[in-house]
């Protein structure tokens, strides 16, 4: 049995199937970890969602920003963006079922010596703390008040983590770090405007702020997988 971690699929169903054939994926025994953003940009988001959902326990999916964008748009809290390509999902007969499945995926996944998140983790968070905070968001997304959460999810403030944060501010920081962040400073102040590969002055790539035993070195005890 093998476990494969796969970055942003983003609606590229044919390419995903080609990748699985390339490493002789055995759906009866192998497991797939998906590092968020199953949908959008590519032409076949609907096929991707159905395929991954039907894998059941053989697939682990963490949420990315495009996944949350689809959920928010389905529920009427976000307008379509010019580049959105998941209209096939919104128009599908099983749209409600698929979106309900998607919004109940975790924010993080930790197993053995590995952890997975879509974007990044703030320097103040251990992996255990990140999993705990991710569960707070998961409970809000899966609970009866999930529409209130979606209504308050968007925004770039607060910019940094504080243990005293509460309510929507607390959850928003967690969502932004785990699904949007590329860069932050050593105090955990996020730069959510930076879209390139190089951080602006005063910021670092998020993983450069973390202990070296948590960013994928061969000898580490804890490793973080993300889509970078």
Identify the residue ranges that each predicted region occupies.
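Single, functionally critical "micro-switch" positions that shape active/binding sites
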Residues: 7, 36, 63-64, 117, ...
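Tryptophan-centered motif/residue detector
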Residues: 33, 101, 125, 205-206, ...
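His/acidic metal-ligating clusters that form di-metal
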Residues: 104-109, 138-219
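A generic secondary-structure signal marking the coil-to-beta-strand transition
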Residues: 2, 98, 112-115, 174, ...
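Active-site neighborhood of divalent metal-dependent phosphoester bond hydrolases
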Residues: 46-48, 54-169
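N-terminal active-site segment of His-dependent metallophosphoesterases
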Residues: 1-55, 68
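Single conserved hydrophobic/aromatic residue that forms the stacking wall/gate
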Residues: 218, 222-228
């Amino acid at each position: 049995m093998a476990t494969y971690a796969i970055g942003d699929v983003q609606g590229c169903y044919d390419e995903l199937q080609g990748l699985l054939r390339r490493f002789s994926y055995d759906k009866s025994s192998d497991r797939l970890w998906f590092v968020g953003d199953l949908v959008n940009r590519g032409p076949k988001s609907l096929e991707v969602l159905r395929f991954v959902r039907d894998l059941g326990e053989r697939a682990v999916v963490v949420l990315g920003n495009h996944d949350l964008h689809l959920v928010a748009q389905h529920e009427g809290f976000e307008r379509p963006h010019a580049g959105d390509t998941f209209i096939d999902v919104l128009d599908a007969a099983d749209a409600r079922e698929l979106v309900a499945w998607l919004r109940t995926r975790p924010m993080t996944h930790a197993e053995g010596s590995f952890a997975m998140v879509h974007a990044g983790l703030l320097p103040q968070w251990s992996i255990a703390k990140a999993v705990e905070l991710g569960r707070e968001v998961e409970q809000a997304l899966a609970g009866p008040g999930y529409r209130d959460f979606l209504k308050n999810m968007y925004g770039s403030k607060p910019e940094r983590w504080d243990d005293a944060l509460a309510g929507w501010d607390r959850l928003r920081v967690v969502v932004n770090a785990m699904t949007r962040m590329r860069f932050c400073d050593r105090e955990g102040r996020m730069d959510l405007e930076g879209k390139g590969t190089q951080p602006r002055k005063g910021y670092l790539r998020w993983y450069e702020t973390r202990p070296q035993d948590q960013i994928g070195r061969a000898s580490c005890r804890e490793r973080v997988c993300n889509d970078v």
